Every structure is written in C-alpha cells, then in structure tokens.
C-alpha cells in the first residue's frame, strides 16, 4: 500500500468514527486537517490549503505560533487547573491586561463565547432585579447571533437558530439593525422596562453586516438616557479582527459590558465578560461561577495572545492586508456580476453573492482555499491576522478563479 492509499484509509477511518460516535450537529466538509503553519493547513494527503477561515475567527495568530506553543508547554509543566476558589496569577494578570486595554471595570472568565453571553444575560437580569423592574425587556437585533445556549438562542435574531426548541426565554424584543427609527420607537414603546441592548458591532453569522456609526452612537445615547446597559458582543470582532484590538475603540465611546472569546485564546478555549465600573458590583460572591473558566493554562495562553498582538505589529498587518483584500474584492465585483456586495472591516469581510455560497466554498476548498459559507449567499473571509501579503493574494487568486466560473 502506497502513502496515498494509507492517507486515504486514515481519512476514511476518521470519517467513519465521526459519523458513528459524534452527534450529527454539523454539516462537515469532506476533509480533515492534520497540522497547520501560520496561514496554511495540511490534510491527510499533505495537500496545502490557505486558511481564510481561522476556525471561525479563532486562530487569529495563525497555526502553531511558536510563542503560543512555548506558553502552552511552559504552563502545562507547572499547573493546568486548581479552581476559582483560589487566587491565580495567570487569571489575575489576564484580567488586568483586558481592563487596561478596554474600559475600567472587572472581568469574569469563561470557557466559551456562549458562556460569556450567559454572563451578560444574567448581568442584565441582575440589573433589572436591582431596580425592581418586574417585566424587564432586553433589546437585541434581527439577524444577530449570540450563541447556542437557551439564553444565547433567546437573544439571537434568527429563526433557523431558534426553531425546534419550543418557547424560549421571554422579555427579549428584536429590532432591525441600522434602523434608527425602530430603535427610538422601541425605547419609547418599552419606556421604563428596557434594561439592556445587546449588539454585535458587525453581525457575523448573518453575513458580515456592519452597524452604522449613527446607529451605534444612537444606541449609546438611548441606553444612557434610559439607564440601560449597552452590551457589545465582540466575540467575533474582538482581538484585532477589525484592525483594532476591539471594534468599539473607533466609536468614541465604550459599552457597559462586552463579551469576548474566539481569538482570545488562539484556539485554546477561553472567553470573557468585561463589566464596566457602574455595573461591576451587581455580581456578588456566589451569584455566578464557572469550574473551568480562566484556569491557569487558558489564562496564560490568552495573556500571551494579547501580548503578541500588541508587540508584533499585528494590527498594522491587518490594515495593510485589509486594504489589499478590499481593493481586489471590489475589482472582482466590477468584473463578475455574481458578486452583489463587498462589506466588512479589517480582516472581517463578507462577500455577498447572487448565488448560494456553499458550492463556492466547496469549490474553493477543492482548489486549496478555506473560506466560510454563511447566511445562504455570503462568503465569509477571515484569514489569520498574521497572513503574509503573498498568501493573501494567492488565496484571492483562488477565490477569483472560482468566481469566474459562476
């Protein structure tokens, strides 16, 4: 048996195990990756792929970053986990770094974005209770995505995510994104009952839909006027994805709370809820918790991730590569009628098509490019923040060759 046959057999065995033992909750592509190096992935046959996906905006520093590997090894030699019933040098240092680079307040560390959203939801409920609001309302946006837990689904403005589970949590109302009049009307309709407004600065799962500056500014003004929390879900936009460490930095104001995950741990599971000073005392001892959240290993990796972003000119590379990507994609839009819109910010890019995006993503994969198909007709482009301009252009060449045929 030659190497190709061995690799094919290994991959087939992997598929059979997955199909037999894993719940059928994912529509997987017909490939398994064995290793990666920065912006490149390699499958069982050692075929090379340029990664424009980053595990859904997770591996922002690429694959197998040497400094991340060293921190994992070093911390694993010392301590994985004790619990949050004891002080942790790694968690304390990470919390300090997050606050110094966001806004004054305190941090709750989690294992995932969904758990960070759960914390934000409980924060809003705690706030309602503290104000004796009997029938509180949390505003969210249509087309939003906030996770797969019951609270996350309840906050998510997409029927396809919510369906099949019966009645979800009450007290959540949805408004159209970037509709200033609808936002004002909601605050008027539920005056005295709104305790929070939660927003993704760029709606990711619905196809990279940026919220306008006017809408975001109005959101801040209305929440302040009505003494409601403004919660930003930066799980996907955070950690340098849009060209700044956090997307809110370019807005001229801060939210009252912010959720993080994905790129925070460079692929190691960790999330965070940052709560501003005004609301940080709503959580008291015993009112919230996590067994694994922010354990020694996860916190050490997250700290190193932020340090790397701040010391390696990563954000400068994001802005350079973003200019290249948007220029080329808009040139493609002029040439190929199949493209209806190019949108996004930094290396968080959506390519809206006039045809379904799944076949496009599959064709790209066959040609050696990993992209994400979302919202039925959007190709989501999220390469590592460390990608070289050479591989960026090679990936865009592959994408263009696929679009030419459609």
From Swiss-Prot:
Q: What does the UniProt entry say about where the protein is found?
A: Cytoplasm
Query: GO terms for CC?
Result: cytoplasm
Name the positions where pyridoxal 5'-phosphate binds: 113-114, 145, 233-236, 291
Origin organism is Leptospira interrogans serogroup Icterohaemorrhagiae serovar Lai (strain 56601)
Signal peptide residue numbers: none
Q: In which pathway does it act?
A: Amino-acid biosynthesis; L-arginine biosynthesis; N(2)-acetyl-L-ornithine from L-glutamate: step 4/4
Q: Does the keyword Transmembrane apply?
A: no
**The name this protein goes by in its record:** Acetylornithine aminotransferase
Question: Record's Pfam families?
Answer: Aminotran_3
Q: Which gene encodes it?
A: argD
- Other remarks in the entry: May also have succinyldiaminopimelate aminotransferase activity, thus carrying out the corresponding step in lysine biosynthesis.
Q: What enzyme category does the UniProt record give?
A: transferase
Keyword set, alphabetical order: Amino-acid biosynthesis, Aminotransferase, Arginine biosynthesis, Cytoplasm, Pyridoxal phosphate, Transferase
Q: What is its EC number?
A: 2.6.1.11
Which residues does the record list as N6-(pyridoxal phosphate)lysine (modified residue)?
A: 262
């Amino acid at each position: 048996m030659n190497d190709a046959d061995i690799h094919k057999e290994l991959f087939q065995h992997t598929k059979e195990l997955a199909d037999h033992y894993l719940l059928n909750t994912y529509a997987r592509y017909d490939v398994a990756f064995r290793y990666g190096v920065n912006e490149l992935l390699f499958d069982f046959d050692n075929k090379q792929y340029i990664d424009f996906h980053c595990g859904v905006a997770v591996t922002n520093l690429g694959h197998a970053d040497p400094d991340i590997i060293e921190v994992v090894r070093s911390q694993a030699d010392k301590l994985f986990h004790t619990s949050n019933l004891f002080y942790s040098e790694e968690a304390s240092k990470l919390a300090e770094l997050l606050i110094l680079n966001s806004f004054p307040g305190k941090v709750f560390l989690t294992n995932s974005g969904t758990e960070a959203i759960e914390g934000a939801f409980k924060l809003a409920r705690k706030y309602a209770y503290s104000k004796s609001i009997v029938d509180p309302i949390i505003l969210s946006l249509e087309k939003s995505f906030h996770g797969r837990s019951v609270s996350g689904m309840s906050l998510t403005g997409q029927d396809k995510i919510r369906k099949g589970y019966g009645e979800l949590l009450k007290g959540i109302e949805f408004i159209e994104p970037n509709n200033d009049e609808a936002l004002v009307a909601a605050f008027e309709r539920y005056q005295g009952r709104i305790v929070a407004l939660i927003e993704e600065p760029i709606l990711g799962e619905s196809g990279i839909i940026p919220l306008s500056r006017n809408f975001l500014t109005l959101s801040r003004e209305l929440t302040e006027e009505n003494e409601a929390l403004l919660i930003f879900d930066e799980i996907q936009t955070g950690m340098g994805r849009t060209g700044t460490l956090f997307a809110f930095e370019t807005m001229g104001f801060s939210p009252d709370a912010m959720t993080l995950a994905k790129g925070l741990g460079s692929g190691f599971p960790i999330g965070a809820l940052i709560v501003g000073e005004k609301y940080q005392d709503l959580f008291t001892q015993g009112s919230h918790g996590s067994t694994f959240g922010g354990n020694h290993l996860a916190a050490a990796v997250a700290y190193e991730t932020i340090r790397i972003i701040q010391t390696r000119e990563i954000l400068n590379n994001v802005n350079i590569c973003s200019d290249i990507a948007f220029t080329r994609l808009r040139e493609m839009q002029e040439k190929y009628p199949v493209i209806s819109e190019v949108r996004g910010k930094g290396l968080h890019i959506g390519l809206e098509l006039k045809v379904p995006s799944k076949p496009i993503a599959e064709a790209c994969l066959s040609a050696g490019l990993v992209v994400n198909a979302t919202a039925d007709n959007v190709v989501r482009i999220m390469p590592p923040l460390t990608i070289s301009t050479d591989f960026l252009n090679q990936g865009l060449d592959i994408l263009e060759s696929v679009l030419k045929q459609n």
